[in-house]
Amino acid sequence: ITLPDCIIQKTSFLKNGGRIIELDNENILLSVGDFLRPLLAQNKERLFGKTLKINVKNKSINIFTSGHRNPQGLYIDKSGTIYASEHGPRGGDEVNILKDGSNYGWPQASYGTQLKFADQGDQWQLPHNIFGHDNFTEPLHAFVGSIGISQIIKYEHAYFENWKNDLFVASMGF
């Protein structure tokens, strides 16, 4: 895939979350929500519901991870571990460790339950194994009961020793 002027045209005002961070000197990571098109998160030909690795030198795009609903935060720690936070549907907000080629399951796997919207886009049904991630990458942590998760960071300093290497997530409310 090569980089167009606009990677994704707006298709919905819901579930279009995302974050952008610098991966290294040549690449950025861009997380993209499913824009109310849940089935596209598993479609390898589409960019919805993915974390994209974009090479800024040659303008190529590769799908880094897939199976995302509504990503909100990205953070790379000093060791190179990539953390992501993501809204679940009704509950099931996730903290994930992103690894190249991994699939986090949306919409076939979720720790949340189905939300009803007037315009829900592609319809999806709850997976047979609700509250599981069979055949998909499990989240590091799932909030069952939504916290409205947002940005994520890892505290890597020594000033507050009790918090060293702890993850912090922002919340839009309980």
Q: Which residues does each PLM region occupy?
A:
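Hydrophobic residues embedded in beta-strands of well-ordered beta-sheets
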Residues: 27-28, 82
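Asp-box/WD-like beta-propeller blade repeats and closely related beta-sheet repeat scaffolds
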Residues: 1-22
